[in-house]
A protein has these predicted regions:
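Juxtamembrane boundary at the C-terminal end of a transmembrane helix
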Residues: 186-196
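Central hydrophobic cores of alpha-helical transmembrane segments
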Residues: 51-52, 173-185
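Membrane-interface helix-boundary motifs at transmembrane edges
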Residues: 35-48, 71-76, 104-114, 165-176
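Hydrophobic transmembrane alpha-helical segments in integral membrane proteins
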Residues: 1-25, 195-196
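A generic, lipid-embedded transmembrane alpha helix
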Residues: 47-70
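Alpha-helical transmembrane segments
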Residues: 11-19, 73-92
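Membrane-proximal helix-loop-helix units in multi-pass membrane proteins
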Residues: 83-153
Length: 196
């Protein structure tokens, strides 16, 4: 009997581990939103912050769904497993930055977000690179599904992250989160058809 697990045995294990990390990120976002509803006057709300929370919630769900393509992976290594868990952790960190434990030292969520934007957009820029590596790991069949828009998202996303990292202008940040959300909706509509 061969004690080495098969790819079919490793995939569910990895999906559980990644799902746990993603679930923690979703929990943080939902708890912050619930806290806003429970105590509406405790901290100042922000459209910018809420849009990023919504965008990241969608990002976590998309990540969880996209990772299902790993079932086609024939060879698993510890490096691949570590990479995938690391990628999930970066998404959790983004959720943690959007759902701080205490913002008493700040003038609401937007003030906190803009003052912590360098951390947020540095990690977000990193996720664009991680997503590219993740797509390459999944291989040819997965990669063939994409058109030019997938390959444009990385340089455009990186430029937008650099702008957001550098400037605290609210209008710029609203435009960037708007572009990010539109791209997420495009991906959702284009790739997630449930018929057939």
């Amino acid at each position: 009997m061969d004690p080495t697990p098969t790819a079919a045995e490793i995939f569910p294990h990895m999906r559980v581990v990644m799902g746990t990390v993603v679930g923690l990120g979703i929990t943080r976002l939902l708890m912050t939103f619930a806290g806003m509803i429970q105590h509406p006057h405790r901290n100042r709300w922000s459209t910018l912050h809420l849009l990023w929370m919504g965008s990241l919630l969608l990002e976590l769900i998309l990540f969880w769904w996209w990772e299902f393509a790993l079932f086609r992976l024939e060879f698993w290594t510890f490096g691949v497993a570590l990479f995938l868990i690391g990628y999930a952790i970066t998404l959790f960190l983004l959720a943690a930055l959007l759902s701080p434990d205490n913002i008493a030292d700040y003038d609401g969520y937007e003030d906190f977000f803009l003052k912590r934007r360098r951390w947020f957009f540095s990690i977000l820029a990193g996720t664009f690179v991680l997503d590219t590596v993740d797509t390459l790991i999944k291989g040819g069949r997965h990669l063939e599904r994409f058109d030019w828009s997938y390959f444009v998202q990385v340089p455009v996303g990186m430029v937008l992250c650099v702008l957001a990292w550098r400037y605290a202008d609210r209008r710029l940040h609203l435009a960037i989160v708007g572009i990010h959300l539109l791209h997420q909706f495009y991906l959702t509509i284009r790739f997630f058809t449930f018929a057939g």
